[in-house]
């Protein structure tokens, strides 16, 4: 039985960064700041919500941008193949109100994410994180119920789950993060990442004898 779960980040790994796309659509360059630049997600989100309020923008405007976002070329095929050989969970600090349309385009994989607090007029008034330090906490919880995790992401907030997993990889990350973490293998293409994940799965697959005695 496959006791592995592959845990992937969403933005920057499978789909373009939502906030960068919205910054370009709305003409507000400050919103291009992401977790690649700011490790403190709580601080980053409060700052983003302040900018949205200042410009009178809400959930509707962001969702209109998200509707036009397509997965990174090759992402859906990568995910389809990966899900055919092992279990996959997307662990993201994004929000369910943002992720829904993107999950449809990716074939409805399982995603663990957070939720926005939205007023009746569409203003985003706050956000609710599922748990603190959600990516790290989630992989540790999976490990506590008998799973081995393999993790990959591109940003500061992915490092916890990558380092806590039996195998972890940077994917499409920044030069600075790669330089700061030379111990982590870093890949740029889905083929490279797939090969790395497959080598981990192969290494931990039970032998036929193990299966016959289980």
Q: Which ranges hold each PLM region?
A:
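Alpha-helical segments flanking ligand/cofactor-binding loops in enzyme cores
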Residues: 80, 140, 159-160
